[in-house]
Amino acid sequence: MSFVVAIDGPAAAGKGTLSRLIAKRYGFHHLDTGLTYRAAAKALIDAGLPLDDEAVAEKTARQVDLSGLDRAVLSAHAIGEAASKIAVMPAVRRALVEAQRAFALKEPGTVLDGRDIGTVVCPDAAVKLYVTASPEVRAKRRYDEIVTGGGTADYTTIFEDVKKRDTRDMGRADSPLRPAEDAHLLDTSEMSIEAAFQAAKTLIDVALNKTI
């Protein structure tokens, strides 16, 4: 049976970086579930299909190849906006959750990060983490990431976008963003990624020892 680490949290909280570090440390497979929605959105855009037709979006979502998710390509702002539109569709979420659950069965273990892993996708995960940080800190991280990459950004715009995404994610009727009752909270507002990794590693090691 696969060992699953579920990592949830709002945008720019550091869950993606933490997930990749954990996957590398333990030799687990990693899936950023947000990219699955972006991949479905990109496929719709590329095919010139509407973003407001749930049946079409569901069919497209079922054809997403989870092994070919290119973060660099899928990080485009336009794709993110399109992904937000189809992510609220229950049929699309069901289709992608099925694919995500199938991915979670991979041996020897998997790390899935997103918004509803511990609550919906993998409620029986061995370890559940909820990674968060203040909106101000998350906006600053996103701003620094863009500027460091050579882009231009406005902090106020990013901050408002972060708050808007939080409201949308937490207020969604289908699979809203919230910590699982048995999730371990990691607030990275004033915590380095290394400290967050060590905290997660301690929890994972304890859980792994229980499975031996």
UniProtKB/Swiss-Prot annotation:
It catalyses: CMP + ATP = CDP + ADP; dCMP + ATP = dCDP + ADP. Keywords: ATP-binding, Cytoplasm, Kinase, Nucleotide-binding, Transferase. CDD domains: CMPK. It is found in: Cytoplasm. It is an enzyme of class 2 (transferase). One of its GO terms (biological process) is pyrimidine nucleotide metabolic process. Its EC number is 2.7.4.25. Coiled coil: none annotated. GO terms for molecular function: ATP binding; CMP kinase activity; dCMP kinase activity. ATP binds at G9, P10, A11, A12, A13, G14, K15, G16, T17. One of its GO terms (cellular component) is cytoplasm. Gene3D superfamilies: P-loop containing nucleotide triphosphate hydrolases. InterPro entries: Cytidylate_kin, Cytidylate_kinase_dom, P-loop_NTPase. Its main location: cytoplasm. Pfam families: Cytidylate_kin. Belongs to the cytidylate kinase family. Type 1 subfamily. This is Cytidylate kinase. It comes from Sinorhizobium medicae (strain WSM419) (Ensifer medicae).
